[in-house]
Amino acid sequence: MKKIVLSCLLAGSLGFSLPALAQGDYPTLSQLNQRLQTLGNQASVELKSLTKTAGGKDIWVLKVGTGNLDEKPAIAVVGGVEGFHVLSVELATQFAEKLVSEHAEKLENTTFYIFPNMSPDAYEQYHAALKYERRGNATAVDHDRDGTAGDNGYTDLNGDGFITWMRVEDPMGDYKLSEEDGRVLVKADRSKGEAGNYLVFKESKDEDQDGKFAEDLKEGIAFNKSMTFKFPVFEPLAGDIPVSQVESRAMLDYLFEQWNIFAFVTFSPANNLSSPLKYNAQNARKRVVTSILQKDEAINAMVSGMYNETISQKAYQQTNQGTDGDFFQWAYFHFGRLSFGTPGYWTPDFKGKDNPEANYLAWADSLGWNEVFVPWTEITHPDFPGKKVEVGGIKPFVMVNPPFEKVGEIAEEHTEFILKLAEMQPKLEIQNLEVESIGNGLTRISLDLFNNSPLPTHSEMGERSRWLRKIRIDLNAPNDRLISGEKIQLVDSIDAFGKTSLSWIIRGKGDISMKAGASHVGFINKTFNL
């Protein structure tokens, strides 16, 4: 209770209130923008709109820190990579608010880049009159390549304001009722001799009469399906080329100029924090690497352990460790940074039900959540004359986004995790310094440049990347005084709690200075009195 009261006092002193205590549902874009503008008024925060989407929505970034922000190691926190994952936007935004109001001391050593919502066009569907789990932006796209954009999307057949499912009784169907819960449909296992009873489609009509349903949605390109790593060519929502949208291009252009980022935390369906990625030697040796590298696997496992110690919810059915064209994998494979992803929330294991939907419904029933399921109701469907068609199923959003009153605790735990990760950032120190006269007016300077951190200065993937700078050591000595050693030295990487040894021989008296580091590990300066 004391912690909550203190948090409220701190937040109030900065001009904003903690949203988890102030409202009953996820914010609208207007409410979110107001909170971001309030944050942008703080001295430690720079709020910038990178661009506007096809729907006219701002893509915001918050750069949070003090002093020389660009020469401190940084963490990038990303929300809204999937438009239907509204929780992710709130977690990123609340992290920014808590960072500024409750943890300002962390800004002395670390800079934070926070991208609260990369899919604002799709996010808006949560508050629209017709609710469905949208991924694409507002760009007009012909997903089925029939010459007309968005001509066969969803249809609210029962008029309840939600897009759920429709099932058609058909002895040649692929689906049957689940034995775990009769409200749920599962694919019949033909290898076990199971017969199907239903055809299953998203709630829609065959508007273009091509025999397909909801294959040309009235939405554009999905941010989280259009990155360069394993780009899913010719798939709906991906576009014709990677990074084709103004928001994805603007973000990547911005990131390529932020040399100090050492790690990403992305709130998305992909999860390598509950369970770390596994190294695959064959995939790691390919020309196009598709496996986490061996040293980075160990880092992922260590950070995953810290995450599981920090987060109270135990992992269940967290099998998504990246999908083609997603941002989480791009940040590692193509940008060379440590990349960590988590949805932040999932349905817990309940009553031993294997099917995710059956498990969710059993859990929801136990909590008295009666508004999460649309009962199957028969309708008349123009595309299935003479057949029994029913509409129903789990409502959109509820399986991936908890009730808003639970978000405060989730945000608190994930803020704690991100700040723990910041404490692990690479940290250069000078150890074993010796300045000794060796006669004839010469002085030898020797030292160890030590990385006092459980993380290496570079991920193994980052060592291969042109987008992660090497450690540079500059000795400010006149050429005629430097007898031995290099004025400029580059070091590929320093291991966790590792070192690199340096030595110079200098002629004469007078101060000599040294600067060592890189933007993503920070810089240290030292003056030697000779």
Language model segments and positions:
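Short glycine- and acidic-rich boundary segments immediately preceding or forming the N-terminal edge
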Residues: 21-58, 405-409
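Edge beta-strands of extracellular beta-sandwich domains
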Residues: 522-530
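Short amphipathic, basic-aromatic surface patches that mediate peripheral association
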Residues: 449-464
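Metallocarboxypeptidase
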Residues: 46-47, 78, 90, 112-113, ...
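Intrinsically disordered, low-complexity Pro/Gly/Ser/Thr-rich segments with frequent PxxP/GP/PP motifs
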Residues: 481-509
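Short, aromatic- and glycine-rich surface loops/edge beta-strands on solvent-exposed regions
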Residues: 510-521
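Active-site/substrate-binding loop(s) of hydrolase catalytic cores
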Residues: 71-72, 86-90, 94-287
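Bacterial N-terminal signal peptides
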Residues: 7-17
